[in-house]
Amino acid sequence: MRRFSAAAGARQQQQQGEAVSDRVLRFRGVLVVVLAPVLLISLVLLLMPRAPASATVEGSAGELVAAAGRRWGPRAVSGLGDGSTRYAVIFDAGSSGSRVHVYCFDGNLDLLPIGKEIELFKQKKPGLSAYAMDPQEAAKSLVSLLEEAEKVIPVELREQTPVRVGATAGLRALGTEKSEEILQAVRDLLQDKSSFRSQPEWVTVLDGSQEGAFQWVTINYLLGNLGKPYSHTVGVVDLGGGSVQMAYAISEKDAGKAPPVAEGEDSYVKELLLKGTTYYLYVHSYLRYGLLAARAEILKAGEGNDYRNCMLEGHHGQYRYGDDIFEASGLSSGASYSKCRAVAVRALKVDEPACTHMKCTFGGVWNGGGGDGQKNLFVASFFFDRAAEAGFVNPKAPFAKVKPSDFEEAARRVCKLNVKDAQATYPDVSEENVPYLCMDLVYQYTLLVDGFGVDPYQDITLVKKVPYSNSFVEAAWPLGSAIEVASSS
């Protein structure tokens, strides 16, 4: 049993009767010492900027990964998750015309709408290469497109918005001196007349492998395939006016089999790190085998007047490509599908003896070995346009499933017609293209089947636009370029 002294009992009785306010006052020194650091820490935490849910984090391979969005490969930089909006302006200076693409990205490089569309897209003809003798006029031809781009970008963001001009096969075909004169005129225009941020190296002739790689990234980005195994990606064939590109992902084993290339030529395989996945991308650009350039190759390849089997009856004239002019008149007996196809095969050099590899496409070029990355093909640009004009694809559809044999069947129908009947049957074909419609369709079928080895009855996807976030985006290489420049800005 505990004993309490009288003094202790008195003290306890005194403490029990003490008011709370008196206690706080008596222990105020202790409270200040304890609570001051707590309050200071809380204040610091309150004032610190909060990272959004989509902030970037470090990926397993040292890649900066957007935690809630898409990501770009090794060139991705910090700060993309800050919720800021950024724009990129990309000019596609092709052989058949000039096009401007304006993209708007959020902090994770996901596309944001521009007005009612997911991008601004405008185009005009002719292309820069049509002004080979007047570089200043070539540059001026871009002014109206530049003005369209400026209209949709807020004034306060224009100075920090990068503008790139990528010239493709048409300008490459002019040679170094003439193409550089045009490019310099464009650089001067952007420096003097544009409110966008430009750098001299951003106005350039794209090499074919860059163009093909950007196109592959664009389509697989929009389809949501990046980050998946290479076998889940799609291959891309892009038929421009001056060149055609083939790009598809291959296995690391096949990448190791890539043959060496001559000095100055692009390597067959590019290694890309995208969404934490390494891809070995086979890509090759075939200069002079775009649709408009191939006409010249076919006209040259004909022995004697063989080429006339590709021209519609009733056409008398010449074909100009670059600085070259070719006779291009039809026979009184009309075109012949089978004879035209023989000329197209010869123009492609399918049996080129220079093939020193196990598998080649045409012209002695290694084909990448094939494989899963090529099984699902997306085929773009002039393939879609001619299919729509020939009537076996809805011209208003963003994409369509077809077979190479559809081009063959359309070619057989067209080659039987004369110019007048073809104009009446295919009203969507421009007057200057009608005489070449038989040739174009024969070439496209021959390119797919004999050139790239696609089965005539394999399903392929003709693509003009790709569905993305309840909208449709142009299936063109500029988006891949825009992602790169936006992520490295």
Curated annotation (Swiss-Prot):
Active site as annotated: 211
Picking any one GO molecular function of the record gives:
ATP binding
Q: Which residues form a coiled coil?
A: none
Binding sites annotated in the UniProt record for ATP: 89-99, 235-245
The record lists the catalysed reaction(s) as: a ribonucleoside 5'-triphosphate + 2 H2O = a ribonucleoside 5'-phosphate + 2 phosphate + 2 H(+)
| Record-linked InterPro entries | GDA1_CD39_NTPase
Keywords from UniProt, A to Z, are:
ATP-binding, Calcium, Hydrolase, Membrane, Nucleotide-binding, Signal-anchor, Transmembrane, Transmembrane helix
User: How does the UniProt record describe the way this protein sits in the membrane?
Assistant: Single-pass type II membrane protein
Known cofactor(s): Ca(2+)
TM regions (residue ranges): 29-49
Classification via PANTHER family: ADENOSINE/GUANOSINE DIPHOSPHATASE, GUANOSINE-DIPHOSPHATASE
* Known function: Catalyzes the hydrolysis of phosphoanhydride bonds of nucleoside tri- and di-phosphates.
Q: Know the name of this protein? A: Probable apyrase 1
